[in-house]
Amino acid sequence: NHPDGYDVYWAEYNKWELWMNSESGKTINPKTMRGPFCESADVPDTAYDDGKLAERAIRDLRRMKEMNKPFFLACGFWKPHLPFNAPKKYWDLYKREEIPLAPNRFRPEGLPEQVRNSSEIYAYARVTDTSDADFQREVKHGYYACLSYVDAQIGKVLDALDELGLAENTIVVLLGDHGWNLGEHDFVG
């Protein structure tokens, strides 16, 4: 342990390929070894990594409370990054047919084709035409489900802070790394 380092670090070893694939274990794109870009499996929150991370964070909060000294806890929730895999109950919060399409689904003039096809989503199975309205609704549905899923996981950690009596003396910072195009300018990614 380096004095300026972490006392504890948690990540599941060598799980990148498993994370990229679906709960069902289907790998469909042989070039990238990635499964579908979205999945609505009827599984508990802990079937996916963000649910496991929330549970781990709560265990760590309990442990750190007992230490009775200042602590730092970073939780790197992954959602809403691809793949848009979330438990079915979060997909069920939204009706796909009621999800609006982007109002500006046109391509910008002069956009080179290689830019249009550079999106990460093409690495996943079943992705051929991101301009299709049904596809864009499916992508938005998955994005909404993943937002609700990660919101629930963050809520569990915040609830634990309250239950443990730590909330009043804890600073919580939420950061995001980027947004998404969900059909705007005929682009998904």
Features from the language model and the residues they span:
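His/Cys-centered metal/cofactor-coordination and adjacent catalytic loops
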Residues: 1
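Active-site-proximal cap/lid insertion segments
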Residues: 9-55, 59-70, 74-189
